[in-house]
């Protein structure tokens, strides 16, 4: 017996599954093919389930911010009742330090600004006020943990950060 499909999607991780799902919602008969034994067993299964909206590319940032809006009402997006046990988006936000190594997030902030992705720039005092378990102290250069100077800070230098309120993580249903 031979099956016919309108689209064969290579991969059954988060991207492949999403492509197959969207095509099927439009009436296409789809088949997802993956080299692993089950959906989501590749890099998707190894992810830490972070939902973030900050990327250095415009396309990456746009795709992530659009996806954020689907996560906000995941059950409706999937066409399910609210009482069905599902993975849930926990919108707790994300703070990223501004460092020389990440060019103080200049490119990321430019992309976020172009797309009206909400963010707040925090000075070092605001970092410690908003997130008391964090420090704005700067550490460096990189040292091995067994180095006696491993935990020494760079005197007189403190880090600001950027907070993205629309970030979070997906729990495990």
Where are each of the predicted segments found?
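Beta1/beta-strand and adjacent pyrophosphate-binding region of the FAD-binding site
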Residues: 2-15, 31
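Dinucleotide-binding Rossmann-like beta1-alpha1 core, especially the glycine-rich loop
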Residues: 48-149
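Glycine-rich FAD pyrophosphate-binding loop
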Residues: 24-44
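Short, flexible turn/loop "capping" segments at secondary-structure junctions
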Residues: 43-45, 87-89, 154-157
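Short beta-strand/turn micro-motifs composed of small residues
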Residues: 11, 34, 98
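Helical element adjacent to the flavin cofactor pocket in flavoenzyme catalytic cores
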Residues: 153-173
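C-terminal lid/capping helical subdomain adjacent to the catalytic/cofactor pocket in oxidative enzymes
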Residues: 2-3, 26, 121-124
């Amino acid at each position: 017996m031979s099956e016919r499909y309108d689209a064969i999607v290579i991969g059954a991780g988060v991207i492949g599954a999403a492509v197959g799902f969207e095509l099927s919602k439009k009436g296409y008969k789809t088949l997802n093919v993956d080299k692993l034994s089950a959906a989501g067993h590749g890099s998707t299964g190894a992810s830490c389930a972070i939902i973030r909206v900050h990327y250095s590319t415009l396309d990456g940032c746009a795709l992530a911010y659009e996806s954020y809006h689907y996560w906000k009402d995941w059950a409706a997006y999937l066409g399910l009742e609210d009482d069905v046990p599902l993975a849930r988006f926990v919108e707790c936000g994300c703070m990223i330090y501004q460092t020389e190594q990440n060019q103080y997030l200049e490119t990321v902030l430019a992309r976020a600004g172009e797309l009206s992705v909400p963010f707040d720039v925090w000075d070092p005092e605001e970092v410690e006020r908003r997130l008391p378990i964090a420090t704005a102290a700067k550490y460096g250069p990189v040292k091995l943990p067994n180095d006696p100077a491993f935990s020494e800070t760079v005197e007189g230098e403190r880090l600001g950060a950027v907070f993205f309120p629309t970030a979070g993580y997906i729990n495990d249903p």
